Amino acid sequence: MVRVEKIKTKKGKRVLVNRASKTVENDKKALFCRGAKTNEIISHAMMDLFDMKKPLTTKMDKHNPYHLFEDETPIVRAGSKFDTSLFVLGSNSKKKPNCLTFGRTYDGQLLDMAELRITSYKSSSNFEAAKMTLGSKPCVILEGAAFESDGDMKRIGNLMVDWFRGPKVDTVRLEGLETVIVFTALDETNLALRVYRPMLKKSATATPRVELAEMGPSISFEVMRKKLADDALFKLACKKPKALMKKRRKNLSEDVFGNQLARVHVGKQRTDDIQTRKVKALRKTPLVEAAPENAIE
């Protein structure tokens, strides 16, 4: 736990209020940390990831000799200090070269963590497409049968979506969708990251024709080590506050198109007892018998 002294300034009080638990949490920030040793590949890859996550980022400039799979306490403590729930650690060693460790925390403890080794890397500077706009909302896509068949890969895919989803927004207009991040599970141990920019072209119809231009970075990973939370802790982390849950309404359902269908129960009505307005035009008039045509007076 991080020791917090008594706050004496208004700015310090605002910081504590911003870090406190909320019904609607703030957008998740990512902490970028370099291990004891890094190389050019790790440095450039982390710079590309840093540009993709801005402005929800915090960087630790110094090298840190963290061994997360032996002791995750330092990174959890650093996350509490900088108010970040996501982190990535870049390291390079003889036994485990070119490794990026992605992780996330929950309630002051480690939730999920996966060590991915870079097998191939192409920087975003090698692509001619326009780069990602600061603060834009990306579209994250998971493809591959391993994300559904393998339990660990399914959790790693969930971690990647949580890591790269960007700020929370209610709606995104078509022209505002500028980035598509695709994670492809080649098998249970290999993962590919590709980043594209949608290009809206003219078409014969009102709907534009969409083409994808790769904008980078392009990274292929091999899953090395992983430390995933148990089902009970993961379920607790995904639990929604009661204040955000909609109350169930009786006799109300929703079809596949989003239309609400309701059923109203009405008792038997006795129309004879209903007092209606009596209008002269609607009054019954007595029938007058017509005289026969051949009648003689």
Swiss-Prot record:
GO biological processes: maturation of LSU-rRNA from tricistronic rRNA transcript (SSU-rRNA, 5.8S rRNA, LSU-rRNA); ribosomal large subunit assembly
Protein's UniProt keywords contain Nucleus: yes
Subcellular location: Nucleus, Nucleolus
Cell membrane keyword on record: no
UniProt-listed InterPro entries: Brix, Rpf2
Pfam families, A to Z: Brix
Keyword field: Nucleus
Chief location bin: nucleus
Family annotation (PANTHER family): BRIX DOMAIN CONTAINING PROTEIN, RIBOSOME PRODUCTION FACTOR 2 HOMOLOG
This protein's name: Ribosome production factor 2 homolog
